[in-house]
From Swiss-Prot:
GO terms for cellular component: pilus. Its main location: other. The keyword Signal applies. It comes from Escherichia coli. Keywords: Fimbrium, Signal. Pfam families: CssAB (PF16831). It is found in: Fimbrium. The gene is cssB. This is CS6 fimbrial subunit B. Residues 1-21 form the signal peptide. Disulfide bonds: none annotated.
Length: 167
């Protein structure tokens, strides 16, 4: 049976063994302006977010940002998904919303790009990992909603949940 040892959703005060792994805002995810990383890792830098710079509107299947993680000792499974994601066509779809224009949003799913273990794009649930192994995931653009053609520059915010489990 898997035991959850680290959760990104909440830090439960006074509970040993539970550590907040991050609830992140992608604060400068601009379409036409260079962006800068704004992520504070909370578990010895085990997880980090790397945004992507845009010169134009994202195209379908474009990479919005990447997630790199090194699995801490004692961890045998990971769950990674956009917080508050919806299931569509068997995938968990998250949303990045323009802070200044909430009508504009980018839908995406998480895809595993490297590392051992099987993980299908947008998969629900946890998947097996090996401790001290590095993994790379990408947030892949699947479309969006906007009132006019193209996105405006601005801050696109969203949350990602990463949970680590041990046997």
């Amino acid at each position: 049976m898997l035991k959850k040892i680290i959760s990104a959703i909440a830090l439960i005060a006074g509970t040993s063994g539970v550590v907040n792994a991050g609830n992140w805002q992608y604060k400068s995810l601009d379409v036409n302006v260079n962006i800068e990383q704004n992520f504070i890792p909370d578990i010895d830098s085990a997880v980090r977010i790397i945004p992507v710079n845009y010169d134009s509107d994202p195209k379908l299947d474009s990479q919005l940002y990447t997630v790199e993680m090194t699995i801490p000792a004692g961890v045998s499974a990971v769950k990674i998904a956009p917080t508050d994601s919806l299931t569509s066509s068997g995938q968990q779809i998250g949303k990045l919303v323009n802070v200044n224009n909430p009508d504009q949003n980018m839908n995406y799913y998480i895809r595993k790009d490297s590392g051992a273990g099987n993980f299908m794009a947008g998969q629900k649930g946890s998947f097996p990992v090996k401790e001290n192994t590095s993994y790379t995931f990408s947030a892949i653009y699947t479309g969006g909603e906007y009132p006019n053609s193209g996105y405006s520059s601005g801050t696109y915010a969203g949350n990602l949940t990463v949970s680590f489990y041990s046997n």
